[in-house]
Amino acid sequence: SGESLEIDFTGSASQTPGFINSSIPNTYSYIFLTLSSMIDDSIPRNEGLFRPVEVKLPQGSVVNPNPPAPCTACTLHAGGEIGEAVAFALEKAIPKMAYVQNVKLGMPVVTYGTNPYTGEFYVDQNVMMSAGWCNAAYGVDGWGALPPFFGAMTMATGELHDMNFPVLTMGREFITDSGGPGKWRGGLGTSTKIKALAPMFAHTYVIGTKYPMRGFSGGMDGSTNRVVLREGTAGEQVVEKTAFESPLSSGDITLA
């Protein structure tokens, strides 16, 4: 109201034993990142913008946890959801500036083991198995998950990936109708299949299996996420939340 803005997270969930609690600096960063990206371009992004904003963060909540709460993944989650909540609140006043301030990413399926071609230990953080950014905005369709990762990390090709690790990339493609329907369609998700060519172990955590990327300003939600280890075998594992040191044999397929 007037020349001030109150952002109140009262009612947020309590802090969690998991590693997605958001520290105060992370929470503030997402609040002001969202605010800065949605207001008029003529307004300088400096201390004068931040000073009239009052932020209320309940102590002991997921947005302001008591130490020593784990916060390792808060850069994405619950950080992304914090940005999303602020964007939804501002959407009512400036709908044309609203867009998805979130990434339903979790983490890539990270594998590690001994490369039989070199005899050396390796860790493969495969960002090809990540999707969920470059979403729709006013006047623009989402453009999917093939651009650089957050605009900061260029994705390697499947061929380059296969040259460096004991795997075979069997395919990577957009999933039809996975973007949220609307006047401007949301960004499409991808389906990636990678076959292990040697024994290895996999780590991952998955989000967006229940709550997908949300639509804005009348747009509909996108599709949910799915990660499958050892697809099509008796030991097939659909990852519900996390997978830790999950063994993959030569020939096993990972789908994400």
Question: Whereabouts are the PLM-identified features?
Answer:
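Glycine/proline-enriched, intrinsically flexible loops and inter-domain linkers
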Residues: 1-256
